[in-house]
A protein has these predicted regions:
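Auxiliary Fe-S-binding modules of radical SAM enzymes
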Residues: 1-36, 233-348
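An N-cap/entry alpha-helix motif that binds or orients negatively charged groups
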Residues: 22-59
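Conserved, mostly hydrophobic/aromatic
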Residues: 47, 75, 113, 166, ...
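Canonical Radical SAM [4Fe-4S] cluster-binding loop centered on the CxxxCxxC motif
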Residues: 53-95
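Generic structural signal for well-ordered alpha-helices
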Residues: 63, 100, 127-131, 153, ...
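Core AdoMet radical
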Residues: 82-97, 103-199, 205-208, 214, ...
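Catalytic cores of alpha/beta
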Residues: 150-158, 215-229, 289-299
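Glycine-enriched alpha-helix->loop->beta-strand junction motifs that scaffold or abut catalytic
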Residues: 157-163, 202-204, 278, 298-305
Length: 348
């Protein structure tokens, strides 16, 4: 990744990449470069063709369910970090099931369960029981938790989990150390290898992402895609997905903003992903504005979140207007707060 000089690519390199039937790694590097910015419309046209060829008009909806926000890491950009003064909460199993019922009643069939990265507060057995509960209500169950060992992933799969998503945050090792000041998350290689351990543990699919804006987004976008590219060759029958989140403000630090990656650049990255990895699912979360999400699902994205709350135990308030007053604080601010029905109607 360090050797990637994106400024060396020319308009001719980008044109050649778009003319090739199969996108090589070198072509992908050209499509991520500044030289590709004037070709965004052509990239979008090509991406739309690839999406239609492999996914048709299908767009999947899911909702994240945060079940705990205790964390043992000190990540300077995250609202859950252990030094941030927020209201901490861990849902009981009764509360988890109540939240799931509310979500399922909205018509959602896929859920992504998340915790803060604390084994002490959210151990594997706790997460496993939450998966068992989720099986009663949802057809597809994802996890976004702290990285675990392959035998623990196998246990979670047996409990009902179908896929695992892990944010590497940034693939820049030096910057990674400056952003993660304490906790198990400081161990870069263990996190990097999490998706492979999940596949070894029997998970059907794995998701990848860098958090754009933490470091050079050209290089992080390249590394995220290559992470999948090489793992695909080792585990060709697994399902793979990419997310492309940008930094969002957090409680007690509203100066964190995704100013380093603009929407046009984000669109370029997503189109490049689709052209380079035509079979890979692409998720766009509620971190992005509704106009962007409504547009990108017509081009490259295959999955979007709906009815989102990043607080703990906050879905009843979100869906019914009833506020228990006991929810835990959110991880970050969302940009698209539309309900499931509103997102569904926008997709029609």
């Amino acid at each position: 990744m360090d050797s990637y000089d994106y400024n060396k690519y020319t308009a001719r390199d980008v044109q050649n990449a778009l003319e090739h039937e199969t996108c090589s790694v070198e072509d992908f590097k050209a499509l991520l470069s500044p030289a590709a910015e004037p070709f965004l419309e052509r990239m979008a046209q090509r991406a739309k063709i690839e999406t239609g060829k492999h996914f048709g008009n299908t767009v999947y909806l899911f909702t994240p369910l945060y079940i705990a926000n205790y964390c043992e890491n000190y990540c300077v950009y995250c609202g859950f970090n252990c030094y941030n003064d927020i209201h901490r909460k861990k849902l009981t199993f009764e509360e988890i099931e109540h939240e799931m019922k509310v979500i399922a009643d909205s018509g959602i069939e896929e859920i992504l369960m998340l915790t803060g990265e604390s084994r002490a507060q959210s151990d594997v057995e706790y997460i496993g029981e939450a998966c068992r509960l989720a099986k009663k209500y949802f057809r597809n169950i994802g996890l976004e938790i702290y990285p675990v060992n392959s035998d623990e992933y196998r246990y979670l799969h047996e409990c009902g989990a179908d896929y695992v998503t892990v944010f590497q945050e940034t693939y820049d090792n030096v910057k990674y150390e400056t952003l993660h000041l304490m906790g198990h998350k400081r161990v870069f290689p263990y996190r990097f290898e999490a998706q492979e351990r999940a596949l070894m543990g029997g998970m059907r699919g794995v998701g990848f992402s860098a958090l754009l804006g933490l470091s050079d987004f050209h290089k992080d976008a390249l590394a995220s895609a290559l992470h999948i590219y090489y793992l695909q060759r080792k585990y060709p029958y697994a399902e793979y997905s990419l997310s492309c989140p940008r930094l969002r403000p957090i409680i007690n630090n509203d100066k964190i903003n995704p100013l380093d990656v603009h929407e046009k650049q984000l669109c370029q990255i997503l189109c490049a992903y689709r052209i380079f990895l035509p079979y890979v699912g692409i998720t766009v979360s509620s971190r992005e504005q509704k106009h962007f999400r409504d547009g990108i699902v017509k081009i490259a994205a295959t999955k979007v979140s709906a009815g989102v709350s990043t607080g703990i135990g906050d879905h009843e308030s979100k869906y019914t207007g009833k506020d228990s007053g006991e929810s835990g604080d959110e991880q970050f601010e969302i940009s698209d707060g539309r309900s499931v029905d509103e997102v569904y109607q926008a997709l029609l």
